């Protein structure tokens, strides 16, 4: 797709920030209050109280699956693509030896940088860098990674692939594969292995439902698990580990990928 307005993805990041505010995800509620005000956050809490247990837990489980994968991989250099208003880097950089590069498009990252400056958090014993980045721009991701300390890196994404069409997924995978080739032992951790769900419940917010339709989110998920596996294999990756959520509907997994 050409001439796409990628900044529109930030709409979902803001909606997700309100949803996460109702969870135990680090800094989620505090950031949402700073961004939207406490009254709006309380309204969001009342709204999600009407959602099913599956919907309530989905985003927290997805977030925590990345944490679990990072523990399994054990890398201290971490690059997160399209972080939105997630503050995983702020939480992880409290540990010594962590070098966390937090990236997103410039407009959203500017909002996030202001929030990070205002949030009350423990001292950082590691390093947190916030850097504007269009991960689909040729060479941009590789250039950003070159400024990381020596050693393997974990490339992380959560809530991104379903906004990319087939050609964009290929471009991103090609960039990431190049980094994994340059840095021996590196891994790609993606929480975005979604398959299409014909029984997906409607969101309570019509604006959210409209956004999902406009972005063709359901269409851009993988058709089935075989399709997801073939995509990554075709792009030169092997699945090192599959983290499956406790969810009877089983529409999403987090995968740890290495190069073949």
What do these predicted regions represent?
Residues 1-79, 83-131, 139, 149:
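Rossmann-like AdoMet
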Residues 140-141, 163-178:
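A short, conserved alpha-helix within the catalytic core of class I
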Residues 142-155:
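A short acidic, Gly/Pro-enriched loop at the edge of an enzyme's catalytic core
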Residues 152-168:
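A short SAM/SAH-binding and catalytic strip from SAM-dependent methyltransferases
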Residues 154, 173, 178-196:
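Conserved beta-strand signature within the Rossmann-like core of class I S-adenosyl-L-methionine
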Residues 164, 210-225:
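Acceptor-substrate binding/catalytic loop of class I
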Residues 218-242:
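Short alpha-helix
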Residues 244-260:
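Core SAM-dependent methyltransferase catalytic element
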């Amino acid at each position: 797709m050409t001439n796409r307005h990628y900044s529109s993805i930030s709409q979902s990041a803001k909606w997700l920030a309100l949803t996460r505010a109702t969870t135990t995800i680090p800094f989620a509620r505090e950031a949402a209050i700073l961004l939207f005000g406490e009254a709006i956050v309380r309204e969001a809490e009342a709204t999600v109280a009407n959602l099913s247990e599956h919907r309530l837990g989905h985003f927290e489980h997805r977030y925590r699956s990345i944490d679990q994968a990072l523990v399994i991989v054990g890398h201290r250099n971490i690059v997160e693509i399209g972080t939105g208003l997630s503050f995983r880097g702020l939480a992880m950089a409290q540990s010594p030896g962590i070098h966390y590069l937090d990236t997103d498009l410039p407009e959203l990252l500017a909002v996030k940088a202001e929030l990070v400056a205002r949030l009350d958090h423990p001292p950082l014993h590691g390093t947190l860098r916030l850097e504007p980045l269009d991960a689909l721009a040729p060479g941009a991701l590789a250039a950003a990674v070159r400024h990381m300390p020596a050693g393997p890196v974990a490339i992380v994404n959560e809530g991104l692939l379903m906004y990319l069409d087939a050609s964009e997924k290929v471009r991103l995978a090609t960039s990431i594969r190049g980094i994994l080739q340059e840095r021996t032992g590196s891994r790609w951790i993606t929480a975005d292995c979604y398959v299409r769900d014909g029984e997906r419940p409607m969101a309570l917010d019509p604006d959210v439902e409209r956004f999902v339709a406009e972005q063709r989110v359901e269409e851009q998920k993988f058709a089935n698990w075989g399709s997801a596996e073939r995509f990554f294999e075709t792009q030169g990756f092997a699945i090192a580990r599959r983290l499956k959520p406790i969810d009877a509907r089983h529409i999403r997994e987090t995968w740890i990928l290495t190069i073949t």
